[in-house]
Amino acid sequence: MFRVCIVILCIVLILYIHPPVTEPMSMRSTDFNQHLNDHGYYIDTDAMSIYDKHDTLIKHYPTLSFNSNESSRIAINKPLTNTILLDHNIPTPTHDIITTQNKNTFKHAKSYFPCVLKPVDGQQGKDVYTHIDSQRQFDLILNQMFKTHDAIMLENLVEGNNYRIFIFNDTILDVIERETPYVIGNGTSTLQELIRHKNNELVSNKRYPVKTMDLSCLQRQGYTLSSIVSPNEKVFITNTINYHNGANPKRIPVHTVDRDNKDMFLKAHRLLGLECSGIDYMSPDITLPYYKNKGHIIEINSKPDTEIHMKAENRPNVFFQTLIQTF
């Protein structure tokens, strides 16, 4: 029974002091304001506008977060966003919504396996469970999620690399690959010791530790927390590939992204009426067109965090310098 639980439960095991979370992209963002000022621009938050040093209006936005309330409402509604994308032939996972009212009569889970469960109103990858491939695992995770959420989104699992595409002023500014957290064995340390050491390093470098670790992820690779990992052996330690869960940000040059992919990202951005967005995209290779390697848009965020772009390669100025060039 203990072994079964190890396979099917995704358990939060490691607790560390969390680095401070930066503000989402908005006119009140300290970093954004500082870089604008450095380049001769300033923001009038009352007018929700950006001006140059000669007081010439550069651009007016509907809200301080750049996006209209309506477009933000659509983007926050994950099922609605998915439906809009599918209606316009943009690849995104098929989905169902499970609520406290229909959970006992919902009988279609098997048709989605392997699947993903995530809260309809979630953010930053919190409470997202992937690689669910059995009814028992599905039921246990679903019941756990209903303790804190009223509606759960069920999706087909999409495999591949995890990318964040940042769009502002109708321009793709930055593309980041979020690399899955892993450890490298040394032949003497247990997997749990290696994970603890990795998290200590992440925190000392002012990065987010791996807080959510999936034991089922370890089991699929043939490991437990007490396993001694062979020298130079790589072990992935979580299915939650998110910057706030220890993922490493790797900048992908925008010019290397396939043109059809870029057109698709901009189309999705415009369909929701957004001025600023962060698109989450899964694909084996973003330099190849989505229709050749089953690339899918997983989510569109109307208030994207800029921290991942600033931390990539420890070059925070690159992102904002590119952003300012859009004015």
PLM features: what roles do these ranges have?
Residues 2-74, 80:
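ATP-binding N-terminal substructure of ATP-dependent carboxylate-amine bond-forming enzymes
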Residues 243, 249-256, 270-276, 283-327:
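C-terminal active-site "lid" helix and adjoining low-complexity regulatory extension at the edge
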Residues 117, 152, 277-279, 298:
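Hydrophobic faces of well-ordered beta-strands that scaffold small-molecule active sites
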Residues 32, 105, 265:
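Aromatic/hydrophobic pocket-lining residues that form π-stacking "cages" and hydrophobic walls in ligand
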Residues 35, 39, 84, 88, ...:
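Generic non-transmembrane alpha-helical segments
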Residues 196-287:
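A long amphipathic alpha-helix within ATP-dependent nucleotide-binding catalytic cores
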Residues 51-212, 258-262:
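Active-site nucleotide/adenylate-binding loops and adjacent lid/helix of ATP-dependent enzymes
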